[in-house]
Amino acid sequence: MVLVLAWTPGCGEEDENKPEPGASAGSGGSGQAGNGGSGQAGSGGLSGGLQPFTTPADPGNGGILVTVSGEDLAINGYPFISGTSKSEGDPPAFVDGWEVKFNHFLVTIGSVTLHDNPDKNPDDPKDMGALVAEATGPFAVDLSIGGPIVGKSGSPDEKTVAIAAFTGPASGGKFQTDQRYAISYTTVAATAQARNVNLDAEGLVLYQQAIAKGWVMALQGKATYKGKPPKAGSVFEKMPREVTFTLGFANPASYLNCQNTDLTPVGDEEFPRGVQVSAGDKTIAQITWHSDHIFWNKLNVEGTPLHFDPIAAAASTYGSKDAPPGVTTMEDLDALDFLAFKTRDGEPLPWRSEVEDFTPPEGTLAFDGNGVTFPKNSFGHFLRYSATSGGHFNANGECEVVLNFTP
């Protein structure tokens, strides 16, 4: 599947939808959302310099509850079992033999909107009908923690957290059960005005770093090499077997008029766009984040192989056999050329495979920008763009993605 991300020139990182002090997270009236109602505190009273958050009350039959999920992969990570794991397995494996786990996976959601008529313009799905309701954050969410609601996969390992609830249109009354409403959301730079949905004390420390650096997404985790012993004298032998990493991306974007995999496909669309409520129950609308997109080796193509070697080869302790655990930062990755990867010591980094369903090319490891150009061939820029494509709806629904930053 080919993905298309649109860049909107002139769109900055400033959030134009910040709530005024004391404002609700919704748009008023029966479309009120987010902190409205009689829900429970979402972060156990821990704000850590952010704004407090109250879990939205159940919107009831005919209402919409908005949740956020990083699926089970943001919570459990990516295991690697030598001789068993596959690039196209479930879950997919890093082809170079690394097990990757996240301690924190932070995303700041700016707003969630509902519009009339998701099918208004089939040639341009970004063109929707009138605004019906809006929940305005920002909401700071840790996808590696999740919440008490089982996600769209049905797996108990997919733990999602609610950020907003719509009981009906902002103008009053109830949603119509015989029509679909276009659903969209935005991501924005981390800010002290964000409501702390579920960040713990350690996550709040990382979030402060995200605020300082203008990051929308911030990840911390650890990778452990689980593949076969590397060849003696190779650059792979000089990599630490354990790498702690911090990744952050200043990549605000709009995810517009999303497809809904809960609905039956019709016509030329893979899935219909929008949400449709039920008179007999609430409807779950799940913002879904796919963490694998960050580690793809080709932009704008679904499901390309995952690699960690470029990050490991940039680690602080790279350079000797049996190197101790190392650390990799975004500054390390910004300095790398993704068209010809090198190690921290400047040696060419070859391709390799530790799985049976990926055959590595000859020569130096190089990623494919697939027509996307950057001011320089920085791996940091590549990662930022690729991470942006991870936003979906209801598991695998595609959205019209508009980049509110310069690639």
Question: Over which residues does each language-model region extend?
Answer:
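Ser/Thr-rich, Pro/Gly/Ala-heavy low-complexity intrinsically disordered linkers and tails
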Residues: 7-54
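Bacterial N-terminal signal peptides
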Residues: 1-6
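A short, solvent-exposed, low-complexity linear motif enriched for acidic/polar residues
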Residues: 49-407
